């Protein structure tokens, strides 16, 4: 453990930031899994409801990724890569460009 007051504060700050970052990353991963699952369900049995569900999860995932970038959890290129991969999956399943 650090003895210097400023070092102790930095340790506390780093831990707080680590937990915040972990929360955002976990939420992005969860939404990504739900989005991919919805896309797979649409691919297996195409319907308007299934497509709307996939679009809903895609939008929610995009939003969470963008918020993580805004808060410095992800680099903007990492976020762009994640979003592009999701859009590619969506386009392959639906034949539409993700909005």
From Swiss-Prot:
Family label: Belongs to the bacterial ribosomal protein bS20 family.
Q: Is Disulfide bond found in the keyword set?
A: no
Q: Which HAMAP family match?
A: Ribosomal_bS20 (MF_00500)
Q: Name one Pfam family in it.
A: Ribosomal_S20p
Name its GO BP terms in alphabetical order: translation
This chain belongs to which protein, by name?
Small ribosomal subunit protein bS20
Q: Which InterPro entries match?
A: Ribosomal_bS20, Ribosomal_bS20_sf
Sorted keywords for this record are: Ribonucleoprotein, Ribosomal protein, RNA-binding, rRNA-binding
Q: Which SUPFAM superfamilies does the UniProt record give? A: Ribosomal protein S20
According to the UniProt record, one GO cellular component term is: small ribosomal subunit
Encoding gene per record: rpsT
Entry's Gene Ontology molecular function annotations: small ribosomal subunit rRNA binding; structural constituent of ribosome
> Which NCBIfam families is this protein grouped with?
S20
| Keyword presence, Hydrolase | no
Look up and give the organism this protein is from.
Picosynechococcus sp. (strain ATCC 27264 / PCC 7002 / PR-6)
Question: What's its job?
Answer: Binds directly to 16S ribosomal RNA.
